[in-house]
């Protein structure tokens, strides 16, 4: 497989993998992030051209997120009968994505593995004991793999020397038009989910699983995202789109979890994961959006599939567990299969 490395600015690197079908994956040691995913020279994900732009404009785009993706209410959690206070995000009043700067702004070490059927970039970092208030020294590995059969695989591992919380994800945004100035409203979405987590006004889950049957968040039959944006569902109105955890009916790499199709039906992304839920966020940024590769990012200009345990699991056991025991290895895998259809 073809592999190139180049300078990404600010002391960071850009590593590009290209398979026999000309599917191109570019990743960086800035935040162990995906920067590009291209098929036939068409861009499939949002991103910037330099490390400096990520740092200045939006460090979460495409990045590895952790220690804990999403919000932890008031930055407080209890573990083994002890209460911990985490760093508070001033905008939300809660802990956001584990605290800032988090995984998204770390300079990760990396090695490259190249094989006949696939190539990988393996990023590693260590989050020290007490970072942003979390207990335990946590060693983290994020492995990005590109296969010859057009799968981008994300494998995340973690091991801590103390009991702690760990709920990582990847914050890639898809826009299959290749044009960040176009909204994703004409993309078609299917989800293997019949329940989601409603939110309070401050985007904290209220702690219940609500059935999606018959409402705007029901994607069990494929439909265009425009139908959601046009709906009057109160949860859609709350965030001006989608920014919610969806609980998967089935997990596993042999089970399709989600499917996103381009407006012209020529590109399809099939997603499989061993995670129990995914946070779907439709880039509800309003008019204040950055310029991205020469174009101003549209409101609703991308969509995330943040595979993880649902935020709030530290308080709501029905959501799952994000408790990582000392010495135990956490691992989660998500696969994105890129399918293209010619005229």
Set out the residue ranges of the language-model regions.
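An exposed, glycine/acidic-rich loop-and-rim segment of catalytic or binding clefts
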Residues: 1-343
């Amino acid at each position: 497989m073809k592999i190139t490395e180049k300078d990404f600015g600010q002391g960071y690197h850009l590593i590009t993998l290209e398979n026999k079908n000309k599917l191109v994956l570019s990743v960086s040691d800035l935040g162990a992030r995906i920067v590009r995913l291209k098929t036939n020279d068409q861009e499939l994900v949002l991103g910037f051209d330099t490390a400096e732009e990520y740092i200045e404009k939006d460090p979460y785009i495409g990045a590895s997120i952790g220690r804990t993706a999403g919000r932890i209410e008031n930055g407080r959690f209890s573990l083994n009968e002890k209460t911990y206070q985490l760093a508070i995000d001033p905008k939300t009043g809660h802990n956001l994505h584990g605290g800032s700067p988090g995984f998204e702004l770390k300079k990760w070490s990396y090695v490259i593995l190249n094989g006949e059927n696939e190539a990988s970039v393996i990023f590693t970092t260590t989050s020290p004991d007490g970072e942003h208030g979390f207990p335990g020294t946590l060693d983290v590995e994020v492995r990005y793999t590109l296969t010859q059969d057009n799968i981008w695989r994300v494998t995340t591992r973690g091991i801590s020397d103390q009991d702690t919380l760990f709920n990582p994800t990847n914050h890639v945004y898809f826009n299959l038009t290749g044009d960040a100035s176009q909204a994703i409203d004409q993309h078609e979405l299917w989800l293997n989910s019949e329940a989601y987590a409603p939110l309070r006004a401050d985007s904290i889950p209220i702690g219940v699983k609500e059935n999606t049957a018959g409402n705007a968040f029901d994607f069990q039959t494929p439909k265009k995202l425009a139908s959601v944006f046009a709906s009057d569902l109160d949860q859609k109105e709350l965030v001006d789109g989608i920014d919610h955890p969806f609980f998967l009916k089935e997990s596993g790499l042999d089970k399709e979890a989600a499917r996103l199709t381009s407006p012209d039906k020529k590109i399809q992304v099939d997603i499989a994961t061993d995670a129990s839920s995914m946070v779907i966020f439709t880039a509800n940024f309003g008019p204040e959006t950055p310029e991205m590769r020469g174009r101003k990012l549209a409101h609703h200009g991308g969509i995330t599939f943040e595979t993880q345990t649902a935020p709030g699991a530290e308080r709501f056991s029905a959501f799952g567990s994000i408790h990582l025991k000392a010495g135990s290895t956490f691992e989660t895998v998500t696969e994105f299969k890129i399918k293209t259809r010619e005229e």
